[in-house]
Amino acid sequence: SNIPDGEAHVMPDGKVYIYGSLDTKEDSWCSNQYKVISSADLEHWVESEISFSIKDVPWADEIQEPTYLEGVKSYNELPEAILTFLPEETREMPIDQFLPLLRNILIEQQKNKSLFAPDCIYKDGKYYLYFCLSDDTEGVAVSDSPTGPFKNAVKLPVKGIDPAVFVDDDGQAYYY
């Protein structure tokens, strides 16, 4: 498997575990599931079964209205992420005609959400997998094992991609 965007952690059993996106197709990145790879010696690696799936995300079927399009009066006001992928010839269409088309595309894309790069920590006897979806929602799921399965996903009150977490020497956990 191809697991890009990896976050490596030494867990209490002394093994290194890598958590990352899971590319399952050659023509696209990310997918709707995660696997974990681990090693006791950094030479021999073991790939887990599916550790987490988008099917375990209660809000995965929700459609987020692209509210950031409200009030846009010109192409220059669109988010940079959209402008990057927007063909130059598209800008010839009047913005008031283009925005409804863009909204429909953005809504349609949400029907095929992906899981982006996760991270995982061990704290108080449990493993916490912090994950994000392609719609910028984020969550956390828990397991008794560093390779999952991670369950009981809870939505976090933040938006973004590729969360990172760590536990400091004093036991305080940080999420960023």
Task: Report the location of each language-model feature.
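Carbohydrate-active catalytic/glycan-binding domains of CAZyme proteins
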Residues: S1-Y176
